[in-house]
């Protein structure tokens, strides 16, 4: 399996619960390396641009409002099969449907406040990483 990079966001609900370290430990425990990371407060414009793919969806405004409701922890994860591995660690979008032991089952409150975001494909990962970490801010380890 190839070494990949994926974007991961610990959302405002999980940041507010003070579980950033526990979530990062799960990534590292699964063999993923953190190649870049930053704590940020997204502006409305940043959130709207990042989630533009969902602009026509009925949940778009709620998603943007949620993502700007508090700080987020944004990281680039690197490792073999990083995209799928991260998605497996996160669990189903709806925490009620997420398998026990996944990040969303353990830390998310609802389908809206679902603790984490992860890229869904190599193409999306490249775009999302460039959005939050332009230039030389990502390092192989």
UniProtKB/Swiss-Prot annotation:
Asked if the keyword Cytoplasm belongs to this entry, the reply reads: yes
The coenzyme or cofactor needed here is:
Mg(2+)
* One annotated GO biological process: UTP biosynthetic process
Q: Which UniProt keywords apply?
A: ATP-binding, Cytoplasm, Kinase, Magnesium, Metal-binding, Nucleotide metabolism, Nucleotide-binding, Phosphoprotein, Transferase
Q: Which residues bind ATP?
A: 11, 59, 87, 93, 104, 114
- Just give the chief location class: cytoplasm
Q: Which InterPro entries match?
A: NDK-like_dom, NDK-like_dom_sf, Nucleoside_diP_kinase, Nucleoside_diP_kinase_AS
Catalytic activity annotation: a 2'-deoxyribonucleoside 5'-diphosphate + ATP = a 2'-deoxyribonucleoside 5'-triphosphate + ADP; a ribonucleoside 5'-diphosphate + ATP = a ribonucleoside 5'-triphosphate + ADP
- Gene3D superfamilies recorded for this chain? Nucleoside diphosphate kinase-like domain (3.30.70.141)
Q: Which SMART domains match?
A: NDK (SM00562)
Question: Tell me, what is one Gene Ontology molecular-function annotation carried by this entry?
Answer: metal ion binding
Compartments annotated for it: namely: Cytoplasm
> EC number(s) in its UniProt entry?
2.7.4.6
- PROSITE patterns recorded: NDPK (PS00469), NDPK_LIKE (PS51374)
Catalytic residues, per the record, are 117
Q: Name one GO cellular component term.
A: cytoplasm
Its annotated function is as follows:
Major role in the synthesis of nucleoside triphosphates other than ATP. The ATP gamma phosphate is transferred to the NDP beta phosphate via a ping-pong mechanism, using a phosphorylated active-site intermediate.
Complex formation: Homotetramer.
Say which family it is in. Belongs to the NDK family.
Q: What is this protein called?
A: Nucleoside diphosphate kinase
